A protein has these predicted regions:
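Short glycine/acidic-enriched loop and turn motifs that connect beta-strands
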Residues: 43-46, 90-91
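Beta-propeller fold detector
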Residues: 6-8, 64-69, 108-113
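Acidic/hydrophobic-patterned starts of short beta strands in beta-sheet-rich repeat architectures
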Residues: 29-41, 79-87
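Repeat-based blade/solenoid architectures
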Residues: 8-23, 68-78, 92-93
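Short beta-strand segments
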Residues: 4-6, 53, 95-97
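Beta-propeller blade repeat segments, especially FG-GAP/WD-type strand-to-loop junctions
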Residues: 47-66, 98-103
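N-terminal "first-domain core" detector
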Residues: 1, 17-31
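Acidic, small-residue rich beta-repeat scaffolds with periodic aromatic anchors
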Residues: 80-183
Length: 183
C-alpha cells in the first residue's frame, strides 16, 4: 500500500489548538464524490474563528487547496454544492458567506453582512443587512417577522438560523452563539 506524507506547517500564529477528537475531518468538500482531508488549525483571533487545512483527494494522492483554509467556521451544503462560512466581525457585526469550488479553488459567491448602524438615533439600535455590499434591509424599516422572512427562517433566501449553516467543528450556529460551544 502506498503512503503519502503530508507536511503541514502552522501559519498565521496564535491558534488555540483543538483536541485530537475534533482535529480531522474526512468529507467531500469539492463535490466530486470523493472524501477529502481537513485538518483543523484551531481557534484564531479574538472572535475565535476556526479554519482548516484542506487536502483534496486526487488520483495521485492528496493536493492542498489553500483557498479553503481562508474560509472561517466552514459548513458543507452538499445539496447546493456550496461551502458556507459564518463569523463575527466584531461585537456588533456578523457575516455569512457562500463559496463555490471552481477548479479546486474556493471562490466567494456572495456574502451577507449584519452591522449596527453607527449613525442611527442613539435611543434605538438599528441593524443593517447587506449582500455583497448592497443594502437589503434595515431593522428600523422592517418588522421582526419581515426580518426573519428575509434572512433567518429556513425558507428565506439565506436561512441563517437553519441546519445547512451548522459548522463542521461543533455543528454550531452564529445566530444562537452555539458556534462557540465545545463539541
Amino acid at each position: 500500500e502506498d503512503t503519502q506524507v503530508i507536511h503541514v506547517e502552522a501559519a498565521g500564529g496564535y491558534g488555540v489548538w483543538v483536541s485530537v477528537e475534533h482535529k480531522f475531518e474526512y468529507v467531500d468538500v469539492n463535490f466530486d464524490g470523493i472524501p477529502d482531508l481537513l485538518i483543523c488549525t484551531g481557534h484564531h483571533g479574538n472572535q475565535g474563528l476556526l479554519t482548516y487545512y484542506c487536502f483534496l483527494q486526487t488520483e495521485n494522492g492528496f493536493a492542498e487547496a489553500p483557498t479553503f483554509t481562508e474560509i472561517a467556521n466552514p459548513a458543507i451544503d452538499a445539496q447546493n454544492q456550496l461551502i458556507l462560512s459564518q463569523w463575527r466581525n466584531d461585537a456588533a457585526s456578523h457575516s455569512w458567506a457562500e463559496y463555490r469550488c471552481q477548479d479546486d479553488t474556493y471562490v466567494l459567491y456572495r456574502e451577507l453582512c449584519e452591522d449596527m448602524d453607527e449613525d442611527a438615533d442613539a435611543d434605538e439600535v438599528v441593524w443593517v443587512w447587506t449582500v455583497n455590499g448592497q443594502e437589503i434591509g434595515r431593522s428600523d424599516e422592517l418588522s421582526g417577522e419581515e426580518i426573519d422572512d428575509l434572512i433567518y427562517n429556513e425558507n428565506s433566501e439565506w436561512g441563517i438560523a437553519g441546519d445547512r449553516w451548522r459548522t463542521l467543528y461543533n455543528h454550531g450556529l452564529t445566530t444562537d452563539y452555539s458556534i462557540y460551544s465545545t463539541p
